[in-house]
Amino acid sequence: MKNFIYIAVIGLLFISCKQKSETKQPEKEISIGEKIANAHGFENWKQVSEIQFTFNVDEDSSHFERSWIWKPKANEVIALSKKDTINYNRSVIDSILTKTDSGFINDKYWLLVPFQLVWDESITISEGIKEEAPISKTQLNRITITYPNEGGYTPGDAYDIYYDDDFLIKQWIFRKANQKEPSVITTFENYQDFNGIKIALDHKKAKGNWNLNFTNVKIN
């Protein structure tokens, strides 16, 4: 009987210790990249089966555009233009499709850069600091992301991303090949909500009548 009680006590102590060890496990810390992605509705991306958008660049009287339909779950892309329609799967890219796909990657990046902070596992993300933003001249948080020198269509590029205290992106600086001088500086403005996903439709420079913008955006 004493042996039974002894074994029972040991068993209870083991269960108690196990429960305490399980409850003491720290929660995974959310990275800055994840916080920015979440602020733009990243948790809703898993429900997306198709996204349509037109990428535009307007400067004074000149206009450039290209339209896309992307089915992320199937990894399918449809490039739409006045001349023709190109339908391809991103898992099979040959030399003929490289130019089309590089255009898609560029345009998608502008549209969904907050999510790229999670999707692009090879990037390096700096610690966030607060400093004066280049266009608004207001105090914003800033991180710098850099890409490896090999792989992708534009290896080695860097971006200085400025975001507010709600983790919404407000401006950015693109630095080609991680050079010191900026290649492009634009705003992120005119945010619209598409089924829980927040997208900045307009990106403007500090001077001049230049606007990289998105139209015909549909997310299903």
Language-model segments: which ranges?
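Tryptophan-centered motif/residue detector
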Residues: W45, W70, Y109-W110, W172, ...
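Sec-dependent signal peptide recognition
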Residues: K2-A8
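N-terminal mature ectodomain segment of secretory-pathway/periplasmic proteins
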Residues: K24, E29-T98, I123, I129-K130, ...
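Flexible, processing/modification-adjacent segments and terminal tails
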Residues: R90-D157, Q179
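Gly/Pro-enriched, hydrophobic low-complexity segments
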Residues: Q139-N220
